[in-house]
Each structure stands twice: as structure tokens, then as C-alpha cells.
Regions:
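Hydrophobic residues in well-ordered beta-strands that form the structural core
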Residues: 37, 43-44, 62-64, 93, ...
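A short helix->loop->beta-strand "cap" motif at the edges of active sites that frequently abuts
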Residues: 31-33, 58-60, 169-171
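Predominantly a Rossmann-like dinucleotide-binding segment in NAD(P)-dependent oxidoreductases
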Residues: 61, 68-155, 160, 209, ...
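Contiguous beta-strand/loop segments that form the cofactor/metal-binding neighborhood of enzyme cores
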Residues: 123, 127-217, 223-225, 250-277, ...
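Glycine-rich phosphate/pyrophosphate-binding loop
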Residues: 220-249, 253
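Aromatic/hydrophobic pocket-lining residues that form π-stacking "cages" and hydrophobic walls in ligand
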Residues: 24, 51, 77, 301-302
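C-terminal lid/capping helical subdomain adjacent to the catalytic/cofactor pocket in oxidative enzymes
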Residues: 289, 293, 307-319
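Beta-loop-alpha module in the N-terminal Rossmann-like domain of NAD(P)-dependent dehydrogenases
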Residues: 1-54
Length: 319
């Protein structure tokens, strides 16, 4: 309403507590303005479903801020796993450990009115879920979960564990998150175990990807340092992955670089949208509105399972 005549917002960035995500996002999309929103996407499932509906009706770019998808090594990991180099995926351990809530603190994340049904699961468990889904290309179909309160008096969980069935049929995963693990700062990591080998990636050491193959020497691939196809493990590498701008190896990339890459990929779709050209917003470069719905479905399925003492609970799907 206060923008100068002839000017329009390129996109809206929403970095508020969870209960203030839906309203500005919905209004912006209705006005044809792209949105980059923090996760989890909304406070509840109904809001998430309504956002999916309006985004797909209006055909407006929408990005969910799963920043760690912006690491070049995360995208490299996705290529390795989804191209079948590890074989059929048997087991995934995706975890996010922190210690900042080990003592009583009065923060909005532990208030159900502002955070929703889960503190730890919604705040960082959704990141662990997104790493699992993005790197493997698999979905979670059922969960057996425990949302636990380790610091007495809290209304929401500060420790979160979900055992998961995966969409490839026989695959299983552990999605775990903790905010009471003293000594852990921002310890997001994923280990993918296939029938041919294992991949390990750590957010606190984001410059490299470790590969372990049965009967072969261990391999470590460093970002922008001589990664080439046909090396005895890697095959053809996607042109867009190899062309992705990175700084020289040894000049450390970290969170800010991942965040910048996420914005750059989203902004490319925003520019295309503004020019009336096709844009993808398909979840291959950044999380989209459907990924946001899946995150909310996961939180709710896990909360339901936990209330039923860990009973297997199916993941809700979009109506």
C-alpha cells in the first residue's frame, strides 16, 4: 500500500515465528508476489493445504527456506544417491543436534500458540527430514515417533526421534533432532547406506562428501577440487551442477554461501516469472510449497504417533 507508484516488490521474505507465516504469505501470493518463507511453512495442516492450493492456482514462485539445500555438497550428494551409485537405499540416519535449550529459556519456540505442535521437531527436525528427502529422492510413508520433554515444565518437545518407513519399500530411516545435547552447536548431518556403499555429509564440515565402498579405499570429494567423472566411482556429472558458481577450494564455503545460493536460484525463478517466462520451482534447487506441506504432515504424524506411544502412523497426503 505504501510502495511508490509504478514500483512493486520483487518478493516477500517471511522470517517471523510460525504463527505469523500463513497470513502474509497468503496475501502476497493472492497479490501475485513471490514468497520466500521460513520453515515450518505454517502453524497447522489446514493453513499448509490452503497455501499449496493458492500457490498452484496463482502460479507464483514460492521458496521454503531450507538453507542447507544450498550447499554445493548437498546437491552433489543428491546426484550421487539419486543416480544409483550407492544402489538401493537400505538405511538413512538424518540428524540435527543442538544444545542451546539444555537450560530453561522463555522463547516462542516452546509455546504451542506460536510454534504449533512441536518445538524441536518443527524447528530443526524438519531440516533433517528435508535433507533425507532431497538427498535420497525418497519420501517417508509411515512414522513411529517420540516427542520428548527433557527440561521439566516445557509444554513442547526439546528432543525428537522418528523411525521411518521409506517409499522404496524396504528402506528405513531415523530422523532425530535434539536441542538439549550440550556440546552440539549446529550439528546437521546425513548418512545414506545403500547396497553398494555409504555416503556421509556434515553441515559443520560442508566442504566435502565422504564415500565408503565395500572392499575399496575410502573416498573424500572436496568442493571445487578436481571432481571429475569416470574416476572409478563417479559417472557423468550434471552440467548445471558443475557450472554452479563456487569460490576456489580452500576458501571455505559455509552457511552464508548456501543461503546466497538458495536466494540466487529462487531469484532466477522470480525474474522469469516477472518476465512472463516459464519457471520451474520444482524442488530441485530449493524447497517449494509442497515440501512445506510434507514438513507439516511429518510434524503432525509424529505428534500423533508420540501421543499413541510410538504407534506406526501414516503420513497425511494432500487432499
Amino acid at each position: 500500500k505504501t510502495a511508490p507508484t509504478g514500483e512493486k516488490l520483487d518478493y516477500v521474505l517471511i522470517v517471523t515465528p510460525n504463527h505469523v507465516h500463513f497470513d502474509p504469505a497468503y496475501k502476497a501470493i493472492c497479490a501475485g508476489i513471490p514468497v520466500l518463507c521460513e520453515k515450518p511453512i505454517t502453524l497447522n495442516m489446514d493453513e499448509a493445504a490452503r497455501l499449496v492450493k493458492i500457490v498452484e492456482e496463482k502460479k507464483v514462485p514460492f521458496c521454503l527456506a531450507h538453507t542447507y539445500l544450498g550447499h554445493w555438497t548437498t546437491r552433489f550428494s543428491r546426484h550421487i544417491v539419486t543416480s544409483g551409485l550407492l544402489g538401493n537405499i537400505r538405511w538413512v540416519d538424518s540428524s540435527y543436534l543442538q544444545g542451546w535449550l539444555a537450560k530453561p529459556l522463555d522463547v516462542w519456540r516452546i509455546n504451542p500458540k506460536t510454534a504449533g505442535r512441536s518445538c524441536c521437531g518443527g524447528d530443526i527436525g524438519t531440516h533433517a527430514l528435508m535433507q533425507l528427502r532431497y538427498v535420497t529422492g525418497l519420501d517417508v510413508t509411515e512414522v513411529s515417533a517420540h516427542l520428548e520433554i527433557m527440561v521439566e515444565g516445557r509444554p513442547l518437545d526439546d528432543h525428537f526421534t522418528a523411525y521411518c518407513k521409506l517409499s522404496n519399500g524396504n528402506g528405513r530411516a531415523l530422523v532425530r533432532a535434539s536441542q538439549i545435547s550440550i556440546g552440539h552447536k549446529n550439528d546437521l548431518g546425513i548418512e545414506v547406506c545403500g547396497e553398494k556403499g555409504t555416503l556421509v555429509w556434515k553441515q559443520e564440515d560442508p566442504e566435502c562428501v565422504h564415500i565408503y565402498l565395500d572392499g575399496q579405499p575410502d573416498r573424500t570429494y572436496w568442493r571445487n577440487n578436481g571432481i571429475t567423472p569416470n574416476d572409478g566411482f563417479l559417472k557423468d556429472l550434471p552440467a548445471d551442477l558443475m557450472a554452479e558458481p563456487t569460490i576456489p577450494s580452500g576458501h571455505g564455503e559455509a552457511f552464508h554461501d548456501a543461503f546466497a545460493r538458495l536466494h540466487r536460484c529462487f531469484e532466477a525463478d522470480v525474474r522469469a516469472y516477472q518476465a512472463g517466462k516459464p519457471f520451474k520451482c520444482d524442488g530441485t534447487k530449493y524447497a517449494n510449497v509442497r515440501d512445506g506441506y510434507v514438513g507439516m504432515a511429518f510434524i503432525n504424524a509424529c505428534a500423533d504417533s508420540s501421543e499413541a506411544k510410538g504407534a506406526w502412523t501414516p503420513m497425511p497426503t494432500l487432499p
